Amino acid sequence: MTKTHTERPEGKRRAPKDREPKASTTSNRRISPPRPSSRGDASRQGAHEKAGGAGLSHSAPGAVVSRRAADRLRRGHLWVYASDVESITLPDAETPPALVPVADSRGLLLGTALYSPTSQIALRLVSREAIGEAEWLELMASRLRQAVGRRKPMLDGENDACRLCFSEADELPGVIVDKYGPLIILQLLARGLDSTAVREKCVRVLREEMAPAAIVERPDPRVRELEGLAAPSQEPLWLADAGAKVASTRFRLNGLSFHYDANAGQKTGAFLDQHANYAAARDWARRLGATGRALDVCCYQGGFALHLAEVCRRVTGVDTSRASLEVAEKNLEANRPRLAAEVDWVEGDAFAILRDWSDAGESFDAIVLDPPAFAKAKRAVEGALRGYKELNLRALRMVRPGGLLVTCSCSHHVGWAELEAAVAAAAADAARRVRLLERRGAAPDHPVVLNLPETEYLKCLVLEVE
């Protein structure tokens, strides 16, 4: 049953997650930067040409990036922000190419990148060499096969859903592929990927490797707007049965059944990055004996709540979205009688509900906090930390002694130390002592690449509250 609280919070939203791995050694080949605009630049270019730096002609397409960006790329990063593009020469400004060679200010080749003229991330490196579109398509197919191959061992009788490709973390910037049971969802999040050739290559690899019932492209409207892209066709990219309907299906995580709708929900539809943490919350509640009453705050479609319902007698899920809570109820019913707990859903603002309930003296054996990203930019970190502290303060006042608190942040810009400091400050204000049991991140199908810090965004603290 869904209850309505008077105040409504933000819906649970997450920023797209694009990441990337360690790079190979930079080539010493050179490209000539665009014709200089100042006498000093001309002198430097002349010195370079006298040194024997052969390369592309001045009219050839190519991007010249700042020293800061070049150093980042050489350390293994894959992004160049628009502010670090010193100059760019295009064959046709009206129709920018998908790929451009990238060089430093001396003309040394750094690689080939997807080009996004309207995005803050202007260049996404796909190779450390100079390659053309045909080579890129074959390289993309090879990397996608490798990414899928790394995930196959993660799929078993308990789990038939996972992230098959995680963008930069699998050396495929802007490419997201998620598997939900028999359905595969594709997201293409960069302008340079918006082509029939790219879609056909992805579909071919996914058909051969996974034999799905359907492959559907699900756009991220916000990202496509930033990239200056129109919405793709709503028709499936591929169907095993031409007459089949693929809008909805079911998938399994940790043995539990979940509803999936390709036309609803956030991100690609579910939060697969948390699936290992769902099981960890359940297991820690059992170990601590925190099996009475549990609370899942910002519960979305019930991931933590349903796992806690395996070991707790009563579970309450709170979210701002009625549509999400309706799916959570479907998920609950699909797992009866395995889940014997009493479960109820409350629609409303997490901050208001926690404030009201903590003031009223409510108590729980286990509480999970999984709010949306509070800091989508560095300038928002200070406010985000206040939000994390407030949520944790209210939760800590309600956790019974010896109970469990699982608190999460999906804000990349909020680091581990900052999150832990916010929780420690909340514990001090609540006059509670907390013991850190585990630091957890995203599930293994969302790997972190150390050369690309942006791939680490999800942080999960498992705490025993005294």
Identify the residue ranges that each predicted region occupies.
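Non-catalytic accessory regions of SAM-dependent methyltransferases
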Residues: M1-G181
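Rossmann-like S-adenosyl-L-methionine
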Residues: L239-E466
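Short, surface-exposed beta-strand-loop junctions and turns on beta-sheet-rich folds
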Residues: S119, G192-L193, Q266
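Non-catalytic substrate-recognition/targeting regions of SAM-dependent transferases
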Residues: C165-D178, V198-F271
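Cysteine-centered catalytic environments shared across enzyme families
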Residues: E133-E135, L139-D160, I185-E235
